């Protein structure tokens, strides 16, 4: 059942308490948008193939989480999910040495942090010289 249960903080500003939205359908706006806040949408699927289909149909791909005890399943899903970061059996901790960025319309298709970010500021040039 889909419930909208956002209760706002009494502090000045726009704050939302942590909220779960259960029973989402793939075509609902909340299931199709990136929400940056303490919000978790729950969209139940029957199997891995349906989960990959739902993830692939999204126009965003910043982050996904996989929870399983089967390491082969974890690798298969992590390789197949169209996201910039995949967490397996954990949440994303992040580290300045690891690249951060998304796929599709999540981010600028570049990576912040890590050598990928440094390389985006460089231009590689190859020069061949015949010296006689």
Which residues does each PLM region occupy?
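Conserved small/polar residues in nucleotide/adenosyl-binding loops
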Residues: 1-5
């Amino acid at each position: 059942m889909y419930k909208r249960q956002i209760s706002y903080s009494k502090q000045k500003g726009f704050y939302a308490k942590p909220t779960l939205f259960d029973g989402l359908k793939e075509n609902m706006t909340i299931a199709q948008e990136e929400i940056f806040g303490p919000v978790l949408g729950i969209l139940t699927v029957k199997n891995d193939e349906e989960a990959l289909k739902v993830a692939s149909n999204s126009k965003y791909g910043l982050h996904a989480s996989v929870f399983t005890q089967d390491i082969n399943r974890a690798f298969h899903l992590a390789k197949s999910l169209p996201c910039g970061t995949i967490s397996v059996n954990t949440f994303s901790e992040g580290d300045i040495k690891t690249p951060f960025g998304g796929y599709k319309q999540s981010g600028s298709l570049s990576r912040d942090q890590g050598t990928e970010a440094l390389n985006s500021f460089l231009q590689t040039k190859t020069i061949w010289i015949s010296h006689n």
